[in-house]
């Protein structure tokens, strides 16, 4: 039986922490769908189409990873993708409570959907998309924290 997992997120922008998680998840599961959420309430810097295109470029070297944009409820998206696992990154203990609530709600909505939590490699444990945007807006150097295509797009946007 093959296992298909979904790694969902807004990925605005995708960071090396995200890349670390999806790369390790790709070794654990047969197929990974990197699911880029529309998330209009978060007022993303990049459009859904731009985020999908950037993610595709960043994970092109991972043959078992597909990138798909979505705006549906995550559990419904998982059903449509015939996936039974959600991969989520946990940077700190502070992330756990919220992630646990999400996992329980997703399990309630789709009883065959399990959540697997991966901690990023230590050098990425403090990175977040919002932090990268904030630091970059104020002239800080975030190049080492972002995949090259994402860094280029972020610099061009600012």
Curated annotation (Swiss-Prot):
Pathway: Cofactor biosynthesis; coenzyme A biosynthesis; CoA from (R)-pantothenate: step 4/5. Signal peptide: none annotated. One of its GO terms (molecular function) is ATP binding. Pfam families: CTP_transf_like. Its cofactor is Mg(2+). One of its GO terms (biological process) is coenzyme A biosynthetic process. ATP binds at residues 10-11, 18, 89-91, 99, 124-130. It is an enzyme of class 2 (transferase). The record marks 18 as: Transition state stabilizer. Keywords: ATP-binding, Coenzyme A biosynthesis, Cytoplasm, Magnesium, Nucleotide-binding, Nucleotidyltransferase, Transferase. Gene3D superfamilies: HUPs. Its EC number is 2.7.7.3. Reversibly transfers an adenylyl group from ATP to 4'-phosphopantetheine, yielding dephospho-CoA (dPCoA) and pyrophosphate. Homohexamer. Belongs to the bacterial CoaD family. This is Phosphopantetheine adenylyltransferase. It comes from Erwinia tasmaniensis (strain DSM 17950 / CFBP 7177 / CIP 109463 / NCPPB 4357 / Et1/99). The gene is coaD.
